[in-house]
Amino acid sequence: MDLSGTRLLKANRATVWAHLNDADTLRAAIPGCETLTGSSEEGFEAVVKQKVGPVKATFKGKVTLSDITPAESYTIAGEGTGGVAGFAKGGAKVWLSDNEGGTELSYTMEAKVGGKLAQLGGRIIDSFARKMADQFFDNFQEQIDGPLDPETDADASPAA
């Protein structure tokens, strides 16, 4: 499953970059994240609870950042196991660029699952991945810009 999208943020690039590397911001942005500890330099440990179709799981895993060009781009990769539910892993390439009065955040991401999760079928997994990506970037944008206004932020929706 591959996804891509763009978000227009009101903050300048330095502020957005700082939030992309901040454990508290990422914890608040990741749907279902119970804990996220660590640093962008050493990597993060995470515990995330999710329900995908009929499968509920608590995933424990690691998130790492690589290919870092400060205030411009990085690659974020994560992998977690959820016991009998299986595993999930994925990554995203994130780019920042200046935009009138703010910052444009662009991303491409991919996700893979195994175990019981993989048995749910591609449509359920694809739909879930899109929902999680949308929710992550909505939450991230709210951490920086404040609550989203559906009318004025309509141009900030992801492209599939």
Where are the regions a protein language model picked out?
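Intrinsic-disorder/low-complexity, polar/charged segments enriched in Ser/Thr/Lys/Arg/Asp/Glu/Gln
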Residues: 2-6, 43, 58-60, 73, ...
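Hydrophobic/aromatic beta-strand elements that line small-molecule binding cavities or substrate pockets
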Residues: 5-7, 34, 60-67, 90-98
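A conserved amphipathic terminal alpha-helix motif
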Residues: 114-159
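A short, glycine- and basic residue-enriched loop/turn
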Residues: 23, 33, 62, 114-117
